[in-house]
């Protein structure tokens, strides 16, 4: 089982430190925070080659959450759209040097929830993803798109629309299934998971109370994770605990891993 944490969950600015913490907490996978590649022209980034070497030495599998802050792959503004694609590709290039084999991105959004705008935004996203997938394939990096909550400003109105969009890529585009997001959405986890399962290679796990994206440790919200343990324990992909709440401590992270592994 490949299971671990998002970089933000570990509350450190050092990737090497995050790798060490991941191992200490019982994980074997770390998801890098792609936005660091862009912040202040990469001022906070460690050399990717040294990250790769340290990860291999510690037997840690690396994935990356591609940049999403101020990024919109569905933007109608050409300059923002082009810069968003450029930013994603820059992060993938850095990630490949660091040794990642899988990367996650957000779909983007629309300023108003209108059928015409949603249709056009999906076309923009499709074109952006064609560029990104072509580059990622050369780097041998798999790209996963994350299911949103399907709120007012999302470019997909529901999970069925999201599923139809993914099918259009003929298997080249995979899914990062976010349990917390699915719990908030109208159709819920069960329906969403069953629909998207053929495309899921990556999972984000965190808890909430079904109303907002709280990113709590397992058991602190209202998701009944016992229902999904068989799926998770037999899952061939990567599982990332995205527990970013300031209320949760490292003991909570460790316990969340143990719950999924069946150690508690």
What is the role of each PLM region?
Residues 9-11, 34-36, 68-70, 107-111, ...:
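Active-site-proximal loop/turn and secondary-structure-junction residues that shape catalytic pockets
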């Amino acid at each position: 089982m490949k299971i671990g944490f998002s970089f933000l969950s570990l509350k450190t600015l050092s990737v090497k430190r995050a790798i060490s913490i991941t191992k200490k907490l019982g994980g074997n996978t770390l998801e890098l925070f792609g936005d660091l590649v862009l912040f202040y022209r990469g001022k906070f980034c460690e050399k990717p080659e040294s990250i790769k070497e340290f990860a291999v030495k510690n037997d840690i599998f690396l994935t990356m959450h591609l940049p999403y802050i101020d990024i919109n792959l569905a933007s109608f503004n050409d300059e923002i759209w082009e810069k968003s694609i450029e930013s994603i590709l820059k992060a993938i290039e850095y990630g490949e040097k660091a040794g990642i084999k899988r990367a996650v991105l957000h779909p983007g959004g629309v300023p108003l929830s209108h059928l015409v705008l949603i249709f056009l935004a999906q076309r923009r996203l499709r074109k952006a993803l064609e560029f990104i997938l072509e580059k990622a394939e050369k780097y041998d990096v798999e790209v996963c798109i994350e299911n949103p909550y399907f709120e007012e400003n999302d470019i997909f109105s529901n999970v069925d629309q999201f599923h139809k969009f993914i099918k259009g890529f003929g298997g080249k585009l995979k899914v990062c299934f976010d349990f917390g997001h699915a719990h908030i959405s109208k159709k819920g986890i069960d329906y969403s998971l069953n629909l998207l399962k053929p495309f899921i290679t990556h999972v984000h796990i965190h808890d909430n109370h079904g109303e907002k994206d709280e990113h709590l440790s397992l058991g602190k919200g209202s998701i009944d994770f016992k229902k999904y343990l068989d799926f998770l324990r037999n899952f061939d992909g990567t599982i990332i605990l995205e527990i970013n709440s300031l209320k949760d401590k490292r003991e909570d992270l460790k316990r969340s891993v143990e719950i999924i592994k069946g150690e508690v």
